[in-house]
Amino acid sequence: MDGRRDCRRSVLRRMLRRLPCALLALGLTATLGSAGVLATRRAQELTGRGAVEQPRLNAAYAQGSEGPAPEAETAHPARFATNLTYTSLDAPDDGSAVARVTWDDAWFSADEGDYNHELAQTSSVLAALAYSESGYYQARENHPPYMENALASLGFGEVSTESYRYRSKVVDEVLDLATGDADGAAYTIARKHLGSGHDDPARDLILVSARGSYGSEWLSNLDMSRDEAGDHGGYVRAAREIGAEVVSWAEESRALGAEVSVLLVGHSRGGAIANLVAAELDDLRAQAGDAAPFGPVYAYTFAAPATTLASDARSERYGNIFNIANPSDIMPYLPLSAWGYERYGVDLELPSAGCADFDRLEDEMRAVYRESVGVECSADAADVLIARTVCDNIAAAVGSAEELVTPVGALTTFRLLATHVDPVRILYSHYPSTYIAWMSVTDESQFVPVPN
């Protein structure tokens, strides 16, 4: 008996001695395996293989088919209302939500500097759809191409979501992190022919909807570097990529004899990117004059962080960019204005507690949310006090963006956020669905302009 026990102990000791080597071998295998997966994915990306193919526009989603037939609300034949389906993080079952929107081709011949609340409300849904599209490129058989379906119902004949192909799966996000490529962004670019060329001049609308923070892209929010114009380093690379694509599409339309209007939308990081694209196009148009390949630029952003240190960000040149923020949402306060950060264009705040008729508006917003998303809205208007207090405390403790990236600045900021902010609760005010519900029950007269 003792001999067998000694034998077992001897075997156990040998196993324990080998355990570190075994664990090391497993670690090396996992590391090499992961490296192999990333190398394979990188090769696929470079050769255009191994990704979900871009969907074609679905003919079943004819103009207005997601809801009742297009409504002849005015004499303009291109004006109608329809339902658009998008996804929300808190929606039950398949995660889908429905929003009623209006569309009017005449919007894109009007003055770009005049705020258009109907266009803004529709833009809030188009911004949310940028997130919804990701599911198609992750699991093609289980998720419809929400963006293509929505834009087909709005009459767009050409839609590209090509940029999602290698920016939607987990392996893509890990690869972007490994290659330092996390500053990019997935986006949709689309074209709709507006004018007939008879009574109205031929006009094309080019739409861009930029996706917000996704996977490793979230880290670019923390990139406090800036370019020569003072624009946020974590957003500017994606903005330049999209801006170049818009110019290319506009030149194609111009070559075919069409005037060109541009619509830019985005939520959160996508809103910041859309903000910079709009400013870039405004600058290009100011420099090129009539030689610019596009005319009016309409930009509507939602929950966008601040984007620039440029001293002229609020100048008249950028008066066509409208940035809509929920005052209970902490993201639009960052990076802090105390550090000199702004957004290009005009900032507008949704109603907050204490505003005239707020209780009625909030009740209406919650009713719309419940009907659209299928659950109660968990956003709390009282979070405006938390958001502003935390930001004031950070500004008092951390004097600049440069100080933020020091160990002391980073730890101080983290401590203040961890002490005062419930990350789950505060995000409810940031949800695209919360913005959509608010946009559905308000108009511009109830917004609070943010002073320059």
Task: Give, region by region, the residue ranges found by the protein language model.
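Short, hydrophobic alpha-helix immediately C-terminal to the catalytic nucleophile
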Residues: N275-A279
